[in-house]
Amino acid sequence: MTDTTISIRKAIDADLTAIVAMLADDALGSTREDNSSPLNQCYTDAFKAIDSDPNQLLTVVEHDGKVVGCLQLSFIPGLSRKGMWRGQIESVRITSDIRGGGIGRQMIEWAIAQCRERGCGLVQLTTDKSRADAMRFYKSLGFVDSHEGMKLSL
């Protein structure tokens, strides 16, 4: 891909099928997501909750009129660090046919700018330990692996 002109916008419900397809399009996502048609109601319910929360922003990335990426930003208030707000970047995906073309970098730089505009003092994200390429990518953008994350499935 030579032209990496993109537009980033707030996701709408019509984008859900494309978003879920991207979430399911890797080794980990294929085991966690339900990319069946019609779309599972759980995604519609989650979208409504995200869309109605002013501290959540689900976005899509368009290139040549097609949705090719997505990410979710959460703006998190906190008491530590003198009441500092944090930006949490999650669900970063790019369609497999255009990965490596610079769009991911543009997406993350845009997300960081959004966090700055909202007054966040830091931006954080997590990625699965098995995603070595993602780790290298985030480090190239200045992220450091300063903390050890833990999860408990419920």
Give, region by region, the residue ranges found by the protein language model:
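Conserved GNAT-fold acetyl-CoA-binding loop/helix
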Residues: 24-46
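Conserved beta-strand in the GNAT
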Residues: 60, 66-75, 93
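A conserved beta-turn-beta hairpin within the catalytic core of GNAT-like acetyltransferases
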Residues: 78-89, 99, 145-146
